[in-house]
């Protein structure tokens, strides 16, 4: 019996311990909560468990504040407060985050650089469709870049020191809005010229498409022009090559080949030249075909073989010895050695 009674008491003891443990934990946690609670008007958890103990009276000021807070949350959107809550001070609630003015101020130049980077990052995706054609950005984008939002966010005493930076930033923004493609090229190639490159700007002195520099270049107009050395008018009026040289007063080839030149085809080979075809072979030349072989020449065909010459035409004529005179009349000429006269017996007289 005793063992049976001892075995039945053990579960009952465990059950009582399990029922008492929550109360003990609630009492141990309720004591510090009651000490640290800012609202002393609300009854604590332990006081609710012990109704026999005297409860403290609620504070009327705290109750009034607690009544105002729900009314603030239910107030209209225009910010009008009820008449009973006029004594509540204006400003942020005490449970909100600390105001921005309480934070330590940062360096204004770092903030300016960060804002500029943010603006460029916002503008780059909008400018991508305009890069290939160099068009203008929409008016909203350009107006957003031109807003002087940076100067208004800084104190007045630092305004004078930040004006040059803001003006340069505005200039770059205007250049980017005007021609995004060339602005990015200028940024990617910092060694290029200081001015922003534009496709519509003239590369020369006389407008777009008239030249490749601000000064006259040697190619291609001037050298090929009126007084140049190579083709164009160089091949024209006064250049050394090649038209006038091939013209009337040049060395090669027209006048040289003309009337008074030394070489063919006209003057050299003309009336008073030393070489063929006309003067050299003409009336007063020393070589054929006309003069040397003509009336007063020493060689055939005419003078040499003519009336008073020895060979071969005059030789066959009346006063020559060979061969015409030898075969002529009156027998005054001797026959060749071993020759016989016609009709004779072969005896020489």
Swiss-Prot record:
Compositionally biased region (Pro residues): 90-101
Coiled coil: none
Main location: secreted
Molecular function as annotated in GO: collagen binding; collagen V binding; fibronectin binding; glycosaminoglycan binding; heparin binding; hyaluronic acid binding; laminin binding
Domain of life: Eukaryota
Cellular component aspect of the GO annotation: extracellular matrix; extracellular region; interstitial matrix
Pfam families: STG
Signal peptide coordinates: 1-26
Protein name (Swiss-Prot/TrEMBL): Uncharacterized protein C6orf15 homolog
């Amino acid at each position: 019996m005793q063992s049976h009674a001892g075995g039945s008491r053990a579960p009952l003891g465990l059950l009582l311990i399990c029922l008492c443990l929550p109360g003990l934990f609630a009492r141990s946690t309720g004591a510090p909560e009651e000490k640290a609670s800012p609202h002393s008007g609300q009854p604590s958890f332990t006081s609710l468990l012990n109704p026999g103990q005297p409860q403290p009276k609620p504070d009327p000021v705290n109750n009034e504040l607690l009544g105002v807070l729900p009314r603030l949350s239910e107030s209209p959107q225009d910010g009008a407060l009820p008449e009973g809550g006029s004594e509540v001070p204006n400003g942020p609630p005490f449970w909100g985050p600390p105001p921005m003015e309480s934070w330590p101020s940062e360096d204004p130049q770092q903030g300016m650089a960060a804002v500029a980077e943010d603006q460029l990052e916002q503008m780059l995706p909008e400018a991508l469709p305009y890069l290939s054609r160099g068009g203008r950005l929409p008016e909203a984008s350009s107006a957003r870049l031109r807003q002087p939002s940076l100067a208004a966010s800084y104190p007045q005493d630092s305004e004078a020191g930040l004006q040059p930076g803001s003006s340069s930033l505005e200039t770059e923004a205007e250049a980017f809005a005007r021609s995004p493609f060339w602005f990015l090229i200028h940024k990617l190639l910092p060694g290029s010229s200081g001015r922003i490159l534009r496709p519509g700007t003239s590369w020369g002195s006389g407008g777009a498409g008239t030249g490749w520099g601000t000064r006259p270049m040697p190619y291609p107009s001037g050298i090929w022009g009126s007084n140049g050395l190579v083709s164009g008018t160089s091949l024209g009026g006064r250049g050394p090559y090649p038209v006038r040289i091939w013209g009337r007063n040049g060395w090669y080839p027209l006048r040289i080949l003309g009337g008074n030149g030394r070489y063919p085809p006209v003057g050299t080979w003309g009336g008073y030249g030393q070489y063929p075809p006309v003067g050299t072979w003409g009336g007063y030349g020393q070589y054929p075909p006309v003069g040397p072989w003509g009336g007063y020449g020493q060689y055939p065909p005419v003078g040499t073989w003519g009336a008073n010459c020895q060979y071969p035409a005059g030789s066959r004529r009346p006063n020559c010895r060979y061969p015409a005179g030898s075969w002529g009349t009156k027998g005054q000429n001797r026959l060749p050695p071993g020759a016989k006269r016609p009709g004779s017996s072969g005896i020489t007289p």
